[in-house]
Amino acid sequence: MTVIRKKHPLIKMINHSFIDLPAPSNISSWWNFGSLLSLCLAVQILTGLFLAMHYTSDTSTAFSSVAHICRDVNYGWLIRYMHANGASMFFICLFLHVGRGVYYGSYNMIETWNMGIILLFAVMATAFMGYVLPWGQMSFWGATVITNLLSAIPYIGTTLVEWIWGGFSVDKATLTRFFAFHFILPFIITALVLVHLLFLHETGSNNPTGLNSDSDKIPFHPYYTIKDLLGVIILLMVFMILALFFPDILGDPDNYTPANPLNTPPHIKPEWYFLFAYAILRSIPNKLGGVLALILSILILALMPLLHTSKQRTLTFRPITQTMYWILVADLFILTWIGGQPVEYPFIIIGQTASIAYFAIIVILMPIAGMIENNILNLD
């Protein structure tokens, strides 16, 4: 077996990536989320494939085809709820994975980090288009509002929006193309994940101390395969409790009403995992400014390596920046809450304050805290 594992061209690649891969001996459970994201992606592709066998991407039948899946297809309700809640689990793992990267300074592996940001954008685009497919009220109005934001782009905006819609409003052409893109993007994401791993294995994994771990490596299998397996079991338990007992807890009741272009819901909002960015978008009264802030709320991650002022890589031994980090996490929770609230006092001012705090902590306060810590520790 060892001979095949080390000699066969294809198995050799798998061996170097998942079996004999040298890994730091001290990486914690925060490093489990990469494998959990792979599991989420696999679940989404499989459940999505079975849903696509029964779904019809036509405005007149899309809503009823989803109802048909839940009522008439064998275990269709389970496949549908696994797919819907799988997206939520995917984003929970994504946010924790990115949060780990920020906390432990993994952004210093620039190629891996930038590929991760591209992946984040791709997953967000896929999830947005998937939310449109059931063709409920929130699907239709969410698609209308979010795609309409592109009209803020000077000169080409209106043309671009009509080009994406395939007409003068969100209609049959929009739904069909969103289904096509929603189907193909997960496979593109899978290819990008392999590139992400390729870049990661060029440098090797980071670790909680942020120090070079070349002198103390252990093989990935069996140590981290077993450790990842524990994470997988916990994730699947949470996932199945969510899908079987509380399938609609993270959804919007409005999406159980078929799309009606003549009736606008009182509060148009995206899925919970976009609410923080939606709150930042709404906090700026100007349309173009809001769109730029929305894009920057994610793209600001690309500036992380440039904003790193500390002589230490991780936040493990940096209490001042640690405090800033946890304030940032709390701020993101506030933004998520505000994104789901109506646009009225006091939510408007809270959203604007939280949005300013979000950018200020990342761009100003954390770099300053890093310099202060350098001075305290005489690292200059």
UniProtKB/Swiss-Prot annotation:
Gene name, Swiss-Prot/TrEMBL: MT-CYB
More info: Heme 1 (or BL or b562) is low-potential and absorbs at about 562 nm, and heme 2 (or BH or b566) is high-potential and absorbs at about 566 nm.
Lipid biosynthesis in keyword set: no
Alphabetized SUPFAM superfamilies for the sequence: a domain/subunit of cytochrome bc1 complex (Ubiquinol-cytochrome c reductase), Transmembrane di-heme cytochromes
Residue spans crossing the bilayer: 33-53, 77-98, 113-133, 178-198, 226-246, 288-308, 320-340, 347-367
Protein name: Cytochrome b
Membrane topology summary: Multi-pass membrane protein
Subcellular location field: Mitochondrion inner membrane
Domain of life according to the entry: Eukaryota
Species the sequence originates in: Alexandromys kikuchii (Taiwan vole)
UniProt binding sites for heme b b562: H83, H182
A cellular component term, taken from the record's GO annotations: respiratory chain complex III
Lineage: Eukaryota, Metazoa, Chordata, Craniata, Vertebrata
Gene Ontology terms describing biological process: mitochondrial electron transport, ubiquinol to cytochrome c
